């Protein structure tokens, strides 16, 4: 009797782990999300931005960050309360 219950518990746990694994994003989806992340820039690393467009670039970057994090939070099932800061 105890062995039967133990086997049932193990089966339930295995099914729970498999269903959770099936809901996770694949490696390709994670890579795509990272490629589209908030740190994307048209400028090569180490370049200096034009100071006259600094505020516009910063504002656009914040908008992209906010959109990215909203999408990431929605995809993970978390509630979005707004960006801190």
UniProtKB/Swiss-Prot annotation:
Record protein name field: Prosialokinin
Biological role stated in the UniProt entry: Vasodilatory peptide. Facilitates mosquito blood feeding on vertebrate host. Induces nitric oxide (NO) release in blood vessels through the activation of the nitric oxide synthase (NOS3). Enhances endothelial permeability and induces edema at the site of inoculation in the host. Induces host smooth muscle contraction. Down-regulates production of Th1 cytokines, such as IL2 and IFN-gamma (IFNG), in mouse splenocytes. Up-regulates production of Th2 cytokines, such as IL4 and IL10, in mouse splenocytes.
BP GO annotations: immune system process; neuropeptide signaling pathway; vasodilation
Main location: secreted
Superkingdom of source: Eukaryota
Modified residues (Methionine amide): 84
Extent of the signal sequence: 1-23
Location relative to the cell: Secreted
Family under the similarity heading: Belongs to the tachykinin family.
């Amino acid at each position: 009797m105890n062995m039967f219950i133990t086997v049932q518990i193990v089966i339930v746990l295995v099914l729970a782990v498999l269903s959770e694994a099936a809901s996770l994003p694949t490696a390709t989806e994670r890579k795509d999300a990272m490629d589209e992340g908030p740190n994307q820039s048209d400028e090569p690393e180490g370049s200096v931005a034009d100071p006259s467009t600094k505020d516009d670039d910063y504002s656009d970057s914040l908008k992209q960050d906010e959109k990215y994090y909203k999408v990431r939070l929605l995809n993970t099932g978390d509630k979005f309360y707004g960006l801190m800061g």
